[in-house]
Amino acid sequence: MGKFGRLDAGVQKTVSGRAYAYCSSVTDLTDEHMPPSSWFIDPKPDNMLTVPACRGCNAAFGRDDDEFRLSLGAVVGMDTPETIEFNRTKVMPGVIKNRRQTRQVLGSTRLLMRTASGASTFGEAALFRVDFGLFCRVGQRLARGLYRFETRTSLPADTPVEVGRVGDPAPYLERIFKGAKFREKGPAFAYWHVIVDDLPTHSVWLFDFYSWLFMIAITGGLIGNLPDET
């Protein structure tokens, strides 16, 4: 299954009949794009998803948004017109502006052999590893935000959220997400999710970034039921 991380749970709150995804603020409220709009190439999809959040939370997420965008650009590479455009318009401007972030990403690079369908080698490429703490924070935020979007409620404070990287999504799509609800927002992002009917805080989410980076998030402790990729 690989490495998983658990982060602190968020807080459930309702203000004037609205549940907020991240904090208990009742002032200076806004809608946050989920995922952040800066991870999408232009033209952006119609009807991008939003969840209610305060401006303070939005501002606090800014650094993670920037660092994950840079890391995502390195991970997805430049193998398709969409990933080329993403790197050209969304990643390179940040590389120029923030040399520290660039050094962090390049410092996690190693050479690997890339294979076609897990079989014949067809070349070498650089493998970029996203900082695991950043990876977990992004996954937890996506799970909580999209849970809020799908259910119109927020996960309770004591609900654990675990996050892991998926190399091959096929076992999950076949065994966990077969027939699951699916949403796609252009080439940049798609997700599948299953929420347990009689245990509504228990859910599993599979996030797809540019059909290259796959992330799974589990709320409520379902990790023992996931398929083994090996």
Feature-to-residue mapping (PLM):
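Exposed alpha-helical structural elements
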Residues: 66-70, 101, 134-137, 141
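C-terminal, charged low-complexity interaction regions
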Residues: 120-230
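Polybasic, low-complexity binding patches
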Residues: 59-95
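Short flanking/linker segments adjacent to small metal-binding domains or redox-active Cys/His motifs
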Residues: 90-132
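Short, charged/polar micro-motifs that form catalytic or ligand-binding hotspots
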Residues: 10-13, 44-47, 128, 132
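Histidine-centered nuclease catalytic patch
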Residues: 19-50, 61, 66-67
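Short, charged surface segments at domain edges that flank catalytic/cofactor-binding sites
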Residues: 1-19
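Zinc-coordinating Cys/His ligand positions in small cysteine/histidine-rich zinc-finger domains
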Residues: 54
